[in-house]
Amino acid sequence: MKASSNITPNTQQIAGLLMKIALVHLRHAYSGGVELYLNQMARYMAEKGEDVTIICRSHADTPPHPNVKFVKLSGFSIGKSHRLWKFAKAVEKHVKESDYDLVYGLAHAWTHDVLRIGAGTSLHMARSLNKPMRIKDRVTHLIEQKAMAPGAYYHVISNSYKSAQEIQEAHHVPKEKITVIHNFVDTNRFDAQRIEKGALELKQQIELDPNKPIFLFLGTGYERKGLKQTLTAFSKLNIDAQLVIVGRETHEGEYIKFAENLGIQDKCKFMGEDKRPELYFTLADCYVLPTLYEPFGFTVIESLACGTPSITTENCGAKEVLNPEVSSVIGADVNPDELAKAMAFWADKKRTTNVSEQCRALALTMDVETVLEKNYQQLLAVYKMKQQSANT
């Protein structure tokens, strides 16, 4: 990974030269938290004039910016575990044969100059779900070990102090080599005033009662996100409320049956996947994410941006940016009684107080452009570090 010049980043920008940078992630798509970061970061750097390539195994039809290129490494593999390892090996080979100035790893590889931890660690994920590590998890853990081995990187960016602590524990990454930059929110997309009409139309379309509190559960992977705990807590409420469930889940039928067994099926609306989360955050009175493991949780601050208070847990990295005026953070054991108490507290606050203004104000401090600039400056600092290392 030999750098193409010996000038500093600041001089590079003044001279109008491009930094040839690659972002590495197994999957490019327009859904998922890490994928959201990948697209926004690639777009931002392309707008800065950098030469941006996304190295991946699969990608969507269109890049996040017209000038962003794809390098697709999709060799033959058998099963998910083999696919992960083969991709990491293919990235290693491709990078060695290329002349990138900076390689930014987002996951699933060990060849990079700077690494971002956006999905936590496989070890802590398994522990949080109280499950043994599967073969895929063990392969992921091995890739993580190589990715964070001494000499494998110049610096690590973490999206929460929670994740930073986990990589220190699991992979012995020195504290001084970690920078924490919390996630961002697109405050233009997630703006209740802008989409108020669409949210009202959706509320009418799915026949929600405007006179009853609306709780929202939204996310992919219902077990980890805590849907059973949400349904149980909802069944304990002494108020007449509604629960909307949005997301992608292979075993959705099991959760519908669980709601039926609790006798709350008539108050629950299972919507399946919907790529308009901003509408749901806007129509809801409270967003509920009682997660068992969440390195950060984009949805928490997306909810705030739409003026909707949230409930999450000590297992969620987003707790680091929250305050009691806009949210409740319940214990790591995700006790349904504690969750029900928090839900009852927030049921009418959006209608009776100025909490929406407070939510929006907090979200604006995490606007996407502001946070991406912090990330960009950190990458430039690593690039300078790499240049200095090459000259010694």
Label the predicted regions.
Residues Y255-E273:
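Nucleotide-activated donor-binding/catalytic signature segment of Leloir-type glycosyltransferases, i.e.
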Residues L292:
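Aromatic "clamp/platform" in nucleotide-sugar-dependent glycosyltransferases that forms part
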Residues R57-H59, V185, L218-T220, Q242-Y255:
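Glycosyltransferase donor-sugar binding loop
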